[in-house]
Amino acid sequence: MLKTQHKVYFKDSAKMGAVKTGSVDLVVTSPPYPMIEMWDDMFSRQSPLIEAALIKGDGSKTFELMHAILDPIWTEVYRVLKLGGFACINIGDATRTINGNFRLYPNHMRILQKALELGFSALPCILWRKQTNAPNKFMGSGMLPAGAYVTLEHEYILIFRKGPKREFKKNNAKKIRRESAIFWDERNRWYSDVWLDVKGTSQALGDKDTRLRSAAYPFELAYRLINMYSAKSDVVLDPFLGTGTTTAAAMASGRNSIGYEIDPALEIVIDRLKDVIVASSKQFIRERLARHVEFVVQRLKTKGRFKYLNQHYGFPVMTAQEKELLLNDPIKITQPETGLFEIKHAVKPQKEFCKNWPAELTKI
């Protein structure tokens, strides 16, 4: 039986004393975006200098002061990560008019600068395209030249590694890594540097104000990153947990997780995970398996037979690295204490995908 633990702290992540140095395999997070108006009050509560700079109309100083609030958290992220561990940070730039001056505030560049100062190695990032059909999406002078502005419809997923490349030396670690593989057809989409197929969050968080405060990113985004940059039973940290999306994705992926959230009002939202995570994870995993089967069927029509079979499911796969791939359903969740969830995961494949496949699928 695969078991995972998921701990949530409602504290400031600038001091993550409960997390040991070098104990985390992966960080997946999305901080409050500096210079986005909805976050002004939150940043100002932590530093009166920010409110003063806003009142004065000093955009550049406000930008730097807001990032100074985030800097200690990135320092903590670097501390708790293992050598070879990854940090994936979803961040959007901001556009804003202050004191009559419209400009871009490049949040991704400021975080990149801090990460490099800490000693992280920067890896190729992902552009997440968030298209909007809002009628007022065009900024500036509309159709007239020398006064209109490019529409900002993308965010960044910055990817960093601490130290040298991770190695899987022990036999059990190698086995877990093989079982944690992703499908070839997923790899071509997931490891692309532009994501066009991940839609914005549609989570039902109870009320509009809660959704705004959380700035939740979609489950699919966190799930992909966790499966791309960690193995089963690894520890995933989110220092800006919000509504618990990263925790939910870790639960669905057979990883352990730690989350920090400074807003106590979100505790009730995160607590609801125990009511929905088992059923929703099973559905998501089955949709993932079904997409692979559909890929197999379509490829057989155009390219012919496959060379390899998955050992657990029996369906064809493109590469030998997918032969031991296994998706573990969460089957039971308990909450032994406030802020702690424990999950038992199935170690056998989903029965409906372990049938006798037609000869045209399995004949090599």
Residue ranges, per PLM feature:
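Surface-exposed flexible segments
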Residues: 103, 169-174
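Active-site-adjacent helix-turn-beta-strand microarchitecture at beta-sheet edges
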Residues: 173-184
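S-adenosyl-L-methionine-dependent nucleic acid methyltransferase catalytic domains
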Residues: 1-139, 148, 183-364
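Proline-centered turn/helix-capping motifs that create local helix->coil transitions or kinks
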Residues: 165-171, 187
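Histidine/acidic-rich helix-loop-helix segments that form or flank divalent-metal centers
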Residues: 144
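Core SAM-dependent methyltransferase catalytic element
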Residues: 82, 118, 147-166
